[in-house]
Regions:
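A short, basic/flexible loop-to-alpha-helix module at the beginning of a structural domain
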Residues: 1-6
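Glycine-rich loop(s) and the adjacent beta-strand/alpha-helix scaffold that form part
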Residues: 27, 31-34, 38-51, 227, ...
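N-terminal FAD cofactor-binding segment of flavoenzymes
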Residues: 30, 37-99, 125-134, 168-176
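Conserved redox-cofactor binding core of oxidoreductases
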Residues: 58-61, 72-74, 112-238
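Periplasmic solute-binding protein
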Residues: 95-116
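A short, glycine/Asx- and small/polar-enriched loop/turn
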Residues: 195-197, 244-250
Length: 315
């Protein structure tokens, strides 16, 4: 069965970027269509899967996609150069993110002039600050208005900081004599009731799943977008973009796991399918007039991917 859909704006992906954009546009009374490659995620069912899982890894609460069963074995023919844990599903990978929302510091935008490496950004911290404020209000961020981690503020966080745990106090007591201190990062997690979501109850399972929805995930704004009039199509894997004579994307084509297919047209198409899927889609949509892929005259689409580098310790 084929579907032919039309909208003012198509948003590909319902993660944090796509859902926020869809919400704002739907509130502005535009006809918005959201296409997500994954299913809706039921929090109660996800919690059951997590509790029953022997290996409580980052994707344990979430059902595997039909084409990627967890029981299949993985054939490694060489070095595994990139292994992402991003999700397909309404809300995207914010379902299993930690929720830490540190701002960049002013010096991060002036790497060349300040430190002599890299490049300076074409925008400054001061230009972005109002948008940081807006994002923190939308997501619901709990943080200290005095402990800013080098990023000055003109406005207050919408919620007070998450209180330190007993373990935090023990670690702080050990670090103190060593000349080190312990601080609390700003968190997209409710320290009080906020935006119709409950206060954090301290389950200590932000990764991979908040059992009560106190930690922000983008399904919050996907739902708000729908309430404002947006249409959300799940299990719709976009595989090709069509461009018009002015080289603008005018239509998208998608398939579903059951074999059905469809297309959608709009005046504006927003690609918000994360740093891997978005360039992949642009490159997959190459044609005679755009042999390097859509929006790739620079030949840099899909290059220079930088993942998150961190050290996580659990105990």
């Amino acid at each position: 069965m084929s579907a032919h859909l039309e909208a003012d704006v198509i948003v590909v992906g319902s993660g944090v970027a796509g859902s926020l954009i869809a919400w704002r546009l739907a509130e502005a009374k535009l006809k918005v269509l959201i296409l997500d490659a994954g299913p809706r995620i039921d929090r109660t069912e996800a919690l059951k899967l997590f509790l029953a899982a022997r290996d409580k890894n980052i994707n344990a609460p979430f059902p595997p996609l039909p084409s990627a069963r967890a029981t299949d074995y993985y054939i490694n023919a060489g070095v595994d150069i990139f292994r992402g844990t991003y999700m397909r599903g309404v809300g995207g990978s914010t379902w299993h993110w930690a929720g830490s929302v540190l701002r960049f510091r002013p010096s991060d935008f002036r790497m060349r002039s300040r430190f002599g490496v890299g490049l300076d950004w074409p925008i400054s911290y001061q230009q972005l600050e109002p948008f940081y404020d807006e994002a923190e209000q939308a997501l619901g961020v709990a943080g200290s208005n005095t402990e800013t981690w080098g990023a000055p503020r003109k406005s207050h966080y919408p919620m007070p900081p998450i209180p330190p745990t007993y373990l935090d106090s023990v670690v702080a007591g050990v670090l103190g004599p060593l000349g080190m201190s312990l601080g609390i990062f700003p968190q997209a997690r409710n320290s009080i009731f906020y935006d119709e979501r409950p206060q954090c109850c301290g389950s200590a399972s932000c990764v991979p799943l908040c059992p009560i929805g106190a930690k922000y995930d983008a399904s919050v704004h996907a739902t708000k977008a729908e309430q404002a009039g947006a249409r959300l199509e799940t299990d719709a894997v976009v595989y090709r973009l069509e461009t018009d004579d002015s080289r603008r994307i005018s239509a998208v084509f998608f398939r579903r796991p059951d074999g059905s297919a469809g297309s959608a047209k709009a005046r504006i198409v927003v690609l918000a399918a994360n740093a891997v899927e978005t360039p992949k889609l642009l490159l997959m949509s190459r044609h005679d007039r755009m042999p390097k892929g859509v929006a790739n005259s620079s030949d840099t689409v899909g290059r220079y991917l930088m993942s998150q580098i961190d050290q996580v310790t659990r105990g």
